[in-house]
């Protein structure tokens, strides 16, 4: 079977970030508003720094009473303007960030629905949930939140440098000699953050997967007293995650300390050169205070720009994980032949299929015909290829060689959506969704059916007795995965769903294997109403349920080794007769 390679190809960080920014295009007006707000913030901050000269010279040296009166009012006005501008920036950026996170979640889930079934075998659900959850949130941080910090603090630095250049360009240029060293520090920090961020996201997925397995199977964990081993496994993964988080904190702390040290070097140079300029009469006390205040304002801004690398690189790592999904090829859907309602003639011609990494095929030269209105039972030992064969009909997988025909045409000739409309599936593990009974029966494209149709199939599926006993009837909430219903009740709702779909092809995948006798009788009775006038394929675990099948296919190691009716196969005394006798032989008492 064709399966996507597990290898992930990452683009360069800059190309990834540029691609991320394309998702912000739809919200460019919000970003323009935010940029205007950030610019106003920077102007207000720079104006305050520039005012340090008149505050010092006019108030403390010249003792100008008029300036001493209007300066406090001007400062209050500046900070009021800065607060309003900051609010506008935060609101616009926040709305854009959350919108982008939502867009990524919807896009990625939409893409997962278009991927081939092999992807779901190769990637744990926990990893998918991490992509939809924290990865999407990290991307929003990288696109918007990191951008906000970079824009705000960069404008703050530029504004402070303009003030410094205005009052003494010689002092400012001398201080800027430390800029190349600062750029080198930030580059090294970015590379380290990016490397660690990839590992952290993978570690988060492993943590979620371990917790999901332990909690989903809590009954087995308790019965087999496996709490300690599960906790040890989870703690080991949590310790790995902790180690990575500590590396992030270590990198952040060291980079912040390095920036502060470079800032201190800049301040020392400022004091040295400014003192020389003051002695030469080229620098007033007000000039010096403005320079010093501007330099002090630059240091925390540079520190934030260094720290934003963590947010930015984590977002880029998450974006690369998301883009690895979005760039994966969709399941093949190249058919153009329209299909209203099929007759249901299914023909397998020399089908061979193989799982990746396995030399032996899971299906080997399988050929048979299932005529409309007939029941084809598929039996065999575990691992003989029964479920793999069934999954080829809705094209969840593609065969390696051979052809599968529906009504005389290859499955690939039909549109996937049209093909799957012809199929109803009832499996052993029935998946119900959190919602009402009515919602679970009238599922997907059947949502618009009238309530009378739902009530009819509930009766036909032998589900009316337990539905009528529920406090809200068809509006009863079944809970997550149908957890408020028994296995037999869930199975009958799945049959009701298949009845409502009224598809010409019915696939039953061991639909009664895990039921008690009473539930099995009710389900079998409902299936007898469902199967007539359809092409039915049954994977049977209990061989007593297929005695009346039109043909029985016996599989072993991916091949059909026997075929015929129940009576014919018993008479041949082959594998089918052996399996049947193993189920029904009398044991000595």
UniProtKB/Swiss-Prot annotation:
Belongs to the ABC transporter superfamily. Lipid exporter (TC 3.A.1.106) family. Involved in lipopolysaccharide (LPS) biosynthesis. Translocates lipid A-core from the inner to the outer leaflet of the inner membrane. Transmembrane domains (TMD) form a pore in the inner membrane and the ATP-binding domain (NBD) is responsible for energy generation. In MsbA the ATP-binding domain (NBD) and the transmembrane domain (TMD) are fused. Homodimer. Residues 32-314 form the ABC transmembrane type-1 domain. Its EC number is 7.5.2.6. GO terms for molecular function: ABC-type oligopeptide transporter activity; ATP binding; ATP hydrolysis activity; ATPase-coupled lipid transmembrane transporter activity. The lineage of its organism: Bacteria, Pseudomonadati, Pseudomonadota, Gammaproteobacteria, Lysobacterales. PROSITE patterns: ABC_TM1F (PS50929), ABC_TRANSPORTER_1 (PS00211), ABC_TRANSPORTER_2 (PS50893), MSBA (PS51239). GO terms for cellular component: plasma membrane. Its main location: membrane. Residues 346-582 form the ABC transporter domain. It is a multi-pass membrane protein. This is ATP-dependent lipid A-core flippase. It is found in: Cell inner membrane. The chain crosses the membrane at residues 29-49, 68-88, 157-177, 254-274, 283-303. The gene is msbA. Pfam families: ABC_membrane (PF00664), ABC_tran (PF00005). The keyword Ligase does not apply. It catalyses: ATP + H2O + lipid A-core oligosaccharideSide 1 = ADP + phosphate + lipid A-core oligosaccharideSide 2. InterPro entries: AAA+_ATPase (IPR003593), ABC1_TM_dom (IPR011527), ABC1_TM_sf (IPR036640), ABC_transporter-like_ATP-bd (IPR003439), ABC_transporter-like_CS (IPR017871), ABC_transpr_lipidA (IPR011917), P-loop_NTPase (IPR027417), Type_1_exporter (IPR039421). ATP binds at residues 380-387. Keywords: ATP-binding, Cell inner membrane, Cell membrane, Lipid transport, Membrane, Nucleotide-binding, Translocase, Transmembrane, Transmembrane helix, Transport.
């Amino acid at each position: 079977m064709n399966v996507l390679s597990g290898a992930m190809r990452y683009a360069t960080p800059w190309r990834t970030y540029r691609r991320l920014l394309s998702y912000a295009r739809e919200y460019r007006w919000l970003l323009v508003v935010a940029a205007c707000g950030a610019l106003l913030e920077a102007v207000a901050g720079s104006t305050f720094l520039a005012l340090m000269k008149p505050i010092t010279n006019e108030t403390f040296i010249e003792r100008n009473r008029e300036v001493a009166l209007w300066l406090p009012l001007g400062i209050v006005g500046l900070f009021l303007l800065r607060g309003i501008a900051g609010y506008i920036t935060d609101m616009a950026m926040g709305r854009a960030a959350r919108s982008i996170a939502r867009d990524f979640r919807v896009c990625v889930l939409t893409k997962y629905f278009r991927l081939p079934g092999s992807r779901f075998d190769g990637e744990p659900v926990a990893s998918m949930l991490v992509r939809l959850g924290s990865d999407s949130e990290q991307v929003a941080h990288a696109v918007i939140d990191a951008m906000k910090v970079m824009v705000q603090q960069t404008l703050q630095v530029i504004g402070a440098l303009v003030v410094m250049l205005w009052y003494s360009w010689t002092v400012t240029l001398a201080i800027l000699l430390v800029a190349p060293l600062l750029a080198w520090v930030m580059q090294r920090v970015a590379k380290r953050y990016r490397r660690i961020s990839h590992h952290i996201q993978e570690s988060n997925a492993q943590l979620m997967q371990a917790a999901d397995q332990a909690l989903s199977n809590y009954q087995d964990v308790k019965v087999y007293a496996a709490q300690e081993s599960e906790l040890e496994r989870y703690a080991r993964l949590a310790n790995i995650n902790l180690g990575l988080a500590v590396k992030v904190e270590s990198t952040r702390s060291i980079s912040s300390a390095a920036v502060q040290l470079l800032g201190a070097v800049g301040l020392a140079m400022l004091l040295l050169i400014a003192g020389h300029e003051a002695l030469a009469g080229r620098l007033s006390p007000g000039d010096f205070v403005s320079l010093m205040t501007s330099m002090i304002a630059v240091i925390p801004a540079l520190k934030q720009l260094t720290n934003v690398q963590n947010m930015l690189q984590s977002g880029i790592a998450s974006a690369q994980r998301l883009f690895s999904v979005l760039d994966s090829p969709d399941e093949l859907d190249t058919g153009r032949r329209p299909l209203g309602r099929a007759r249901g003639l299914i023909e397998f011609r020399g089908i061979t299929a193989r799982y990746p990494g396995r030399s032996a095929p899971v299906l080997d030269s399988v050929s048979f015909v299932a005529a409309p209105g007939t029941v084809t039972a598929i039996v065999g030992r575990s691992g003989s290829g029964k479920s793999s064969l069934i999954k080829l009909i809705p094209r969840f997988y593609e065969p390696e060689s051979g052809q599968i025909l529906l009504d005389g045409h290859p499955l690939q000739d039909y549109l996937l959506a049209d093909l799957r409309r012809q199929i109803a599936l009832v499996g052993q593990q029935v998946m119900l969704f959190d919602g009402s009974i009515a919602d679970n029966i009238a599922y997907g494209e059947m949502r618009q059916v009238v309530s009378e149709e739902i009530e009819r199939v509930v009766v036909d599926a032998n589900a009316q007795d337990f539905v009528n006993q529920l406090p809200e009837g068809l509006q009863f909430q079944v809970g997550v995965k149908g957890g408020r219903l028994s296995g037999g009740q869930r199975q009958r709702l799945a049959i009701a769903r298949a009845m409502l779909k009224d598809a010409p092809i019915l696939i039953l995948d061991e639909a009664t294997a895990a039921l008690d006798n009473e539930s099995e009788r009710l389900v079998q009775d409902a299936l007898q109403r469902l199967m007539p006038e359809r092409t039915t394929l049954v994977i049977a675990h209990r061989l007593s349920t297929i005695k009346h099948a039109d043909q029985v296919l016996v599989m072993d190691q991916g091949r059909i080794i026997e075929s015929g009716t129940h009576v014919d196969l018993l008479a041949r005394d082959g594998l089918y007769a052996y399996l049947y006798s193993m189920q029904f032989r009398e044991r000595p008492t």
